[in-house]
Amino acid sequence: MPSLMLSDKKEEKKMKKKMALDTPELDSKKGKKEQKLKLSDSDEEESEKKKSKKKDKKRKASEEEDEVKSDSSSEKKKSSKKVKLGVEDVEVDNPNAVSKFRISAPLREKLKANGIEALFPIQASTFDMVLDGADLVGRARTGQGKTLAFVLPILESLVNGPAKSKRKMGYGRSPSVLVLLPTRELAKQVAADFDAYGGSLGLSSCCLYGGDSYPVQEGKLKRGVDIVVGTPGRIKDHIERQNLDFSYLQFRVLDEADEMLRMGFVEDVELILGKVEDSTKVQTLLFSATLPSWVKNISNRFLKRDQKTIDLVGNDKMKASNSVRHIAIPCNKAAMARLIPDIISCYSSGGQTIIFAETKVQVSELSGLLDGSRALHGEIPQSQREVTLAGFRNGKFATLVATNVAARGLDINDVQLIIQCEPPREVEAYIHRSGRTGRAGNTGVAVTLYDSRKSSVSRIEKEAGIKFEHLAAPQPDEIARSGGMEAAEKVKQVCDSVVPAFLEAAKELLETSGLSAEVLLAKALAKTAGFTEIKKRSLLTSMENYVTLHLEAGKPIYSPSFVYGLLRRVLPDDKVEMIEGLSLTADKTGAVFDVKQSDLDLFIAGAQKSAGSMSLEVVKVMPKLQEREPLPQKRFGGGGRGNRFGGGGGNRFGGGGGRGRGGSGGRGQRY
């Protein structure tokens, strides 16, 4: 009972409160009725009533407006939420998102840690096929992620897929995976990927390549590994030493197959692939940037008949990377050492640069002429090469000068610029060299220097499906302007505390020089930027203090000797002999050549004396020139008198007493 009484009292209190709240409304209604009666008796009260109504209308209108605003703002919030949800939906629906594939949690976490949230097209296109056990030929442009296209599905298959039950376990186990690559540098990088991703799944790998200790490699194989990555030569050696057993092999991969052909590994690769007794029990994957006939032959011989092919290049004429800007600049060998630093300044954008030269001698001499660069070629000891490559990857120096040995072994996202000292004779080599930049979604620049008289630039354009931008060498005055801007920024950064120490010298210079403050400051900036003079640079050969002239004879010109004959009629022989880079125009109506800046007036005056037999003018825009393919060179050679850099005490990049000639001396080397 007490509880009932208590609740009744509470209810009573609630009722009283409710009545108290309702009463003002009733009272106000009652008051309004009384007010109406009173207002009918008085005009004054009537006017008051009208005013009151107006106020009520304004108040109601204001309230309605607030409601509309409130509704519209809430609608905006709803719509903005819808927009955000829409964006999120788009991100989730990315068909190449890692979450869309059968990738286990440890691998997903590792990919996320490396900033990979979606697979590249070649990876996405091949993942399910490889994981489901199909033999595959994969083709994509250089730098498009072919390595992870086989690393990820192979690892998943070994741990969670079809290969798990067949994998041998324990000490001394035979490998389940064999990966062949053309260079030790590339082999080490692929092995590093298997270590990084496979390590998270408890799988072990080893890398076998020449130059590394046999006993160390043999020890790893004896203890047992799941994955073997290596170069054909060293893999073949271990097979002959009976260190490799392919009885439990489930995957064999040929990466950069086209490059193995180019580097002469055909017999080794075929021998290694033939060591698998029952190829029907092994899944074979072949990845390549191009598909020459040997690669197609290998796929027909060693892959199953129901093999799959994923070709992301197809009939597209563009075989080289489409994220790379391709530039061709005419250059005389003697101008190269001075030109290359300016090219780096113009096109590297603060990133790293790789310079490719054709021989070890070129690499050594050029790296010695470029500040802060390092050399990489086949005669450098392996241990030093590894230190050099590690330093380049870690950004300890910005410029690497290399032979083709490094072309396929570097996968560094920050390489912004590739410079090739001359067009390679093989188009595939150009594709792979230029592919060292513009990787992993980045953009890059590939500059090719060429001799305008003998060049394979047009052939590369045709076969690689690219279009070169034919540009003149960066002119020193352009470089100076850029350097002046950088110097000005450095001046602004000078701490105010050091200014008083230089004020006296500045005042004295201003008073005694007879120059304006503006001119003095410009000279100071020039000195800071490293310029004490600006030399003109030829459009034809890029040589400093030379100017390019265009000769026309009013009739077709079929040979350089005709041009020399015209010039000798009006000019001294010694001056004619000193012209550089004589080339005929593509339309056969003229020729271009370089003369020293100091001889320009002499040549122009000579043309005026020719009685109209020829005309000469300074070239502003280079006309299209006839090209001559360079003569084929033997793979081996060397020795002899002088060298290709200029012979006779000088070098190729800075002149010298005479032209070097290869002899019939010692045997050359591959790199």
From Swiss-Prot:
Keywords: ATP-binding, Helicase, Hydrolase, Nucleotide-binding, Nucleus, Phosphoprotein, RNA-binding. The modification Phosphoserine is found at residues 40, 42. One of its GO terms (cellular component) is nucleus. GO terms for biological process: RNA metabolic process. Residues 339-479 form the Helicase C-terminal domain. ATP binds at residues 140-147. Residues 127-309 form the Helicase ATP-binding domain. Residues 636-671 have a biased composition (Gly residues). A motif (DEAD box) lies at residues 255-258. One of its GO terms (molecular function) is ATP hydrolysis activity. Residues 26-41 have a biased composition (Basic and acidic residues). It is an enzyme of class 3 (hydrolase). It comes from the Eukaryota. A motif (Q motif) lies at residues 96-124. It is found in: Nucleus. Residues 50-60 have a biased composition (Basic residues). The keyword ATP-binding applies. Its EC number is 3.6.4.13. Residues 1-84, 627-671 are annotated as: Disordered. It catalyses: ATP + H2O = ADP + phosphate + H(+). InterPro entries: DEAD/DEAH_box_helicase_dom (IPR011545), DEAD_box_RNA_helicases (IPR050547), GUCT (IPR012562), Helicase_ATP-bd (IPR014001), Helicase_C-like (IPR001650), P-loop_NTPase (IPR027417), RBD_domain_sf (IPR035979), RNA-helicase_DEAD-box_CS (IPR000629). PANTHER family: ATP-DEPENDENT RNA HELICASE DEAD (PTHR47963:SF8), DEAD-BOX ATP-DEPENDENT RNA HELICASE 47, MITOCHONDRIAL (PTHR47963). Belongs to the DEAD box helicase family. DDX21/DDX50 subfamily. The Q motif is unique to and characteristic of the DEAD box family of RNA helicases and controls ATP binding and hydrolysis. This is DEAD-box ATP-dependent RNA helicase 7. The lineage of its organism: Eukaryota, Viridiplantae, Streptophyta, Embryophyta, Tracheophyta.
